[in-house]
Amino acid sequence: MTGEFSRRSFLKYTALTAVAVAGSSLLSGCEYGYNPVQNAPGTSNVVLKVRTTLDMVECHADDDGSNATTIFKLVVTNGRKNALEVTKENFAVKAEGYLAYQNDKLQVIYPDSLSYQLKQGETATYYVQAKGLNPWENGPVTLTYYPDLQYSEFSANWELTADALKSAT
């Protein structure tokens, strides 16, 4: 072998390398999106220039544990140029044997997001109510906030154990 590398050989090996790199990403998979996870009330996540702080978690239930309702108080600051519309579709609450996502179990109590949009630089407090959720019995609880539903691979998450909730109350 002379050690020379022809133009044809160069192009052939370059194409082969490109195919190998593309194939390896198909086999290994790619992690798309950004999903930070916090583990306690009072913590913040920043996703898509939207800062969200889980300020407080309250649970109300009858003495026997029935008629449980959990309320999450979220403070949202919009750092984006476009306005945010925050509705119940932006949230999901999951726990053992419990899922509230775009159904009647989940409700944004305040403010009325259909008549109010959060503009750039504005901060609003949202109360998200999960009906039928008792975090002491169904825990751990995961609250997910999707700032922009068009980019559902980006979300802010809070995984809350019973111990984290007890220390917050």
Label the model's feature ranges.
Residues M1-V21, S25:
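N-terminal secretory signal peptides and thylakoid transit peptides that target proteins
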Residues S66-F72:
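Short, solvent-exposed loop/turn segments enriched in Ser/Thr/Gly
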Residues Y32:
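Short, conserved catalytic or interaction motifs in soluble domains
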Residues G65-S66, T77-A124:
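The feature marks short-to-medium sequence segments in extracytoplasmic or secretory-pathway proteins
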Residues K73-T77, Q129:
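Short edge beta-strand/loop segments characteristic of extracellular beta-sandwich folds
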Residues V37-G65:
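Low-complexity, acidic Ser/Thr/Pro/Gly-rich terminal tails and inter-domain linkers that flank the onset
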Residues E122-T169:
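Surface-exposed edge beta-strand/loop patches
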Residues S28-G29:
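C-terminal motif of bacterial Sec signal peptides marking the signal peptidase cleavage site
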